[in-house]
Amino acid sequence: DPNTLILDVETTGMLKDDPETEIVSFSLINMKGQVVLSSLVNPGRPIPLVVQKIHGVEDRDVKDAMPWAVIGDILAYQMTNKHVVAYNAGFDIHLVVHLCGKYGIPIPEFEVSCAMEYYSQFVGEWSKQKGDYKWQRLPKLAYGSAHDSLVDCQSTLLLLKKMSGDFSDEPSSDDINLDF
């Protein structure tokens, strides 16, 4: 579907714990795995070490990057009238919308789906405490570092394909050259 995009963001923390949370990187890909937009973002404040250890984005990486007030408008434009899928959409989408509001960027109209909710239901592990399916971590299916926004987008795409029964990205014996 050309109107469906996959989004992932990496941040300075959790909005519920820190109202000044900023995005430090984001990626947006289409359903063919092609990059629509991917960028580091200068949060205008130091990235806490505990968070740097999770996603690997350091202050020196973002010092020359554009701030959200500039690049957020480009992302919002790309998301307009699209179906945006995110793994843990409640976190990623909420933060994008929050930062658009904070910086006076018009909030785009778009449809949202949470790949984590679908995957949790697919796995089927029930949480009596929540009265719902237990949230599952995003499996690292793409090459690269987990918690890199582009790698996480690619892993989300591969996960969606696998859940739908599409194993076309799986290597087959035809892909292996045994002439050595």
Where are these regions (language model features)?
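Residue-level marker for buried hydrophobic side chains located in beta-strands
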Residues: 5-7
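Metal-dependent phosphoesterase core characteristic of DEDDh/y 3'-5' exonuclease domains
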Residues: 2-3, 16-25, 29-57, 77-180
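Short acidic, Gly/Ser-rich segments with clustered Asp/Glu that frequently serve as metal-coordination loops
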Residues: 9-17
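Metal-dependent phosphoesterase signature
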Residues: 53-74
